[in-house]
């Protein structure tokens, strides 16, 4: 059998990069070390669709440029991973607070099916929530800490302990099947009682926004295609215009977001927006922007910064993020500081 993707030596991979894709390779040893550390598939597969001139050829760039673009991608992935974990913890804390205040701290009561919708937003309480959490509660291998510690030391497992062991996806599913009273309590905390959107709009933004953050977090954690990924359920930029001033650009009559913003909200920018929305202090929001800039520019002198700007411009094309991203972020911070 002639395989579609046969094994290629490093020398053969370099030849393909040079002959098929037109990548400029002046330092052969450097190119080989790049392929050893990154892999041919990650180097070309992750970037060629945006940078190519035609169906085959990338835009006459050097192997060094591809390498730097890959490092930038990984730096931004690490940044998103860091803040996705922060948002996950924040969300679980809010969920635990609302559920404990509504149903108490006895697991048999706060996980009683009568307290939840049977089915909502594609989520079944019994099949998608309870059955998953039950695996943690009945674990015999004592793998789930700190839940197992509470099983051994105390007479109950409060939700703020149990939720430390459930997955981000399970916590989102639990949110989906909350009844309106509890769901409204959650979104009022997350939106700081903002009345600029309807209840249904807030519910959808949290559901889709958190799902998108989880997806991008998983892509980064498992070394999957990150930059060019587009979500199936994008957040609606028009709904975010009031709560994230400066981050969404609208048409002159303010009836529709610009097309670039519609496209951006199907990619990585959707995760950036929701993370900023959920960070609940100006200090955290400012740190988020600072860390984002450091992920792109840190450790470089002025001359090298010009190269990083070019790299980031190409990265914005890959991700569909607005190229004036940092201008928008600083405008948002300025508005926030004036409000609070």
Report the location of each language-model feature.
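Acidic/aromatic/glycine-rich contiguous surface patches that form carbohydrate-binding/processing clefts
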Residues: 223
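Extended intrinsically disordered or low-complexity regions, especially N/C-terminal cytosolic tails and loops
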Residues: 1-215, 227-340
């Amino acid at each position: 059998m002639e395989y579609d993707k046969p094994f290629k030596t490093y020398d053969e991979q370099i030849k393909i990069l040079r002959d098929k894709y037109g990548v400029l390779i002046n330092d052969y040893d450097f190119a080989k070390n790049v392929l050893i550390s990154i892999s041919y598939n990650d180097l070309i597969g992750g970037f060629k669709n945006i940078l190519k001139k035609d169906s085959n050829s990338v835009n006459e760039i050097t192997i060094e440029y591809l390498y730097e673009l890959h490092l930038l991608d990984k730096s931004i992935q690490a940044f998103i991973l860091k803040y996705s974990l922060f948002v996950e913890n924040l969300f679980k804390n809010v969920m635990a607070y609302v559920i404990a205040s509504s149903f108490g701290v006895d697991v048999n009561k706060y996980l009683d099916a009568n307290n939840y919708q049977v089915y909502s937003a594609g989520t079944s309480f019994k099949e998608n929530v309870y059955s998953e959490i039950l695996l943690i509660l009945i674990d015999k291998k004592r793998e789930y800490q700190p839940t197992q510690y509470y099983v051994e030391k105390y007479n109950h497992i409060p939700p703020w302990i149990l939720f430390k062991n459930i997955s981000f996806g399970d916590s989102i599913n639990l949110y989906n099947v909350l009844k309106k009273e509890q769901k409204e309590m959650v979104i009022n905390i997350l939106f700081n009682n903002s009345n600029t959107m309807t209840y249904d709009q807030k519910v959808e933004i949290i559901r889709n926004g958190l799902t998108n953050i989880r997806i991008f977090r998983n892509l980064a954690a498992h070394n999957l295609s990150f930059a060019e990924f587009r979500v199936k359920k994008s957040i609606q930029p028009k709904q975010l215009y009031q709560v994230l001033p400066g981050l969404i650009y609208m048409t002159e009559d303010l009836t529709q977001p610009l097309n670039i913003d519609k496209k951006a909200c199907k990619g990585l920018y959707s995760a950036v927006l929701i993370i900023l929305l959920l960070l609940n202090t100006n200090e955290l929001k400012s740190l988020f922007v600072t860390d984002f800039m450091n992920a792109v520019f840190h450790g470089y002198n002025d001359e090298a910064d010009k190269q990083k700007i070019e790299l980031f411009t190409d990265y914005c094309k890959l991700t569909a993020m607005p190229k004036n991203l940092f201008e928008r972020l600083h405008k948002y911070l300025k508005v926030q500081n004036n409000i609070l």
